[in-house]
């Protein structure tokens, strides 16, 4: 689960992290009032969407030369004008795709006198089972370019969660950022505070970009992006309350209500599979046969007829879907139950696109018999390769 920047900063502040003063705003008037509560004389008006690259982003509705989603304002009138420009408009960034995201809230913060910018992030390294703290002296909006052009400028400090954060980890961060004296001590302390926040709230990713040194010698978290492990949210009702469903795909929200793992993609073949690994293999083989998956959808190991019906409805809610491939390997899950769900779903949604089904595993013959006797135009497949070839052929035939 993702949260907005202003929420991330409020959370980090509870762990002692230094952040600029700021207030969220839902209207232009609220943005003006937020600015009046801050000392100024410079304010920063920030679009709040669940995507990075806001500073270099562009608003669809504004002229091409208009500023992006992070703007300096030198007067209250500029705050008002910038807020009016952003609210209700669609911000397109490197992370949103061409569709962009509508800006429904802003974050007005105090300006900072910046001397230097740095980069610091933390994430779970699943390969090693450790926490990776990634730092660079090249902070700011172009960290992706730094990673591409000069990867040697990015350092990784690995922390074993069983050992926890130790002083030498903090010193390694400060050394990598080339900080000395009091700034070195601040960096050591900040690294520990961020680690504590990361662990205590079950974050999966924390990105500070930029971390700045101000002209008066202070380290300040100027921007923060946070994601949480959704599987751990039951332990954090306070964090779950921060969820902004307007930033999420409605189909993904509906899928979560049925305990379905659904991610919308840009292709035209809808996929319903049990197991993440099999789902990824299914998507790969669709691409191998010349078309692209419209989604990742894992129904899990305990799918019921109702769950399968919901999965079909979610897949077909995407108007780009031109065909559906169901690929089920029934171990815990019974193929006859899946077949019943497929038949019920196809009838309920009045299926109008080609459907190819590959079943294997527990009660597979009963499942195949149910599909064959359903009277529905369901194409059966014997294996994964056969299924991919058939769905591509059926979609092309229907075009």
From Swiss-Prot:
Q: Which residues bind substrate?
A: 274, 331-333
| Needed co-factor(s) | Mg(2+)
Q: Which PROSITE patterns match?
A: ATP_GRASP
Top-rank taxon, per record: Bacteria
Q: What reaction is this protein's catalytic activity?
A: succinate + ATP + CoA = succinyl-CoA + ADP + phosphate; GTP + succinate + CoA = succinyl-CoA + GDP + phosphate
Q: Which residues form the ATP-grasp domain?
A: 9-254
Give the Gene3D superfamilies listed for this entry.
Answer: ATP-grasp fold, A domain, ATP-grasp fold, B domain, Succinyl-CoA synthetase domains
Pfam families to which the protein is assigned, alphabetical? ATP-grasp_2, Ligase_CoA
Enumerate the residues binding ATP: 46, 53-55, 112, 117
Assigned EC number: 6.2.1.5
Query: Where along this sequence does the record place binding of Mg(2+)?
Result: 209, 223
Cofactor binding mode and count: Binds 1 Mg(2+) ion per subunit.
Described function: Succinyl-CoA synthetase functions in the citric acid cycle (TCA), coupling the hydrolysis of succinyl-CoA to the synthesis of either ATP or GTP and thus represents the only step of substrate-level phosphorylation in the TCA. The beta subunit provides nucleotide specificity of the enzyme and binds the substrate succinate, while the binding sites for coenzyme A and phosphate are found in the alpha subunit.
The molecule here is called: Succinate--CoA ligase [ADP-forming] subunit beta
């Amino acid at each position: 689960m993702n949260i907005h920047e202003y929420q991330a900063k409020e959370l980090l502040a509870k762990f002692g992290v230094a952040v600029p003063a700021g207030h969220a705003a839902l209207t232009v008037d609220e943005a003006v009032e937020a600015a009046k509560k801050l000392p100024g004389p410079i304010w920063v008006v920030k679009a709040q969407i669940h995507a990075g690259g806001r500073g270099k982003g562009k608003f669809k509705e504004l002229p091409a030369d208009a500023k992006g989603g992070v703007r300096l304002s030198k007067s209250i009138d500029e705050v008002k004008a910038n807020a009016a420009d952003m609210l209700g408009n669609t911000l397109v960034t490197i992370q949103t795709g061409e569709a962009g995201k509508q800006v429904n809230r802003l974050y007005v913060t105090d300006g900072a006198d910046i001397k230097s910018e740095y980069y610091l992030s933390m994430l779970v390294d699943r390969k090693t089972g450790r926490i990776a703290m990634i730092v660079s002296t090249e902070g700011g909006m172009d960290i992706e370019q730094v990673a591409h052009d000069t990867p040697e400028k990015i350092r990784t400090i690995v922390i074993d969660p069983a050992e926890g954060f130790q002083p030498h980890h903090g010193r390694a961060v400060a050394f990598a950022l080339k900080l000395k004296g009091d700034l070195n001590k601040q960096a050591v302390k900040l690294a520990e505070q961020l680690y504590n926040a990361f662990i205590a709230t079950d974050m999966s990713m924390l990105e500070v970009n930029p971390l700045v040194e101000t002209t008066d010698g202070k380290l300040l978290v100027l921007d923060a992006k946070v994601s949480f492990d959704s599987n751990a949210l039951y332990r954090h009702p306070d964090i779950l309350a921060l969820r902004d469903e307007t930033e999420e795909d409605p189909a993904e929200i509906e899928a979560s209500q049925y305990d379905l793992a659904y991610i919308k993609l840009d292709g035209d073949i809808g996929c319903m599979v049990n197991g993440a690994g099999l789902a990824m293999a299914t998507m790969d083989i669709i691409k191998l046969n010349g078309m692209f998956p419209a989604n990742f959808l894992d129904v899990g190991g305990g799918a019921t007829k109702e769950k399968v019906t919901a999965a079909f409805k979610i897949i077909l809610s995407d108007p780009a879907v031109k065909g559906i491939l169901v690929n089920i390997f029934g171990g815990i899950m019974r193929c006859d139950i899946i077949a019943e769900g497929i038949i019920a779903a196809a009838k309920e949604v009045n299926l109008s696109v080609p459907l190819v089904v590959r079943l294997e595993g527990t009660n597979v013959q009963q499942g195949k018999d149910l599909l064959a006797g359903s009277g529905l135009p369901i194409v059966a497949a014997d294996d994964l390769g056969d299924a991919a070839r058939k769905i591509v052929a059926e979609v092309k035939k229907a075009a």
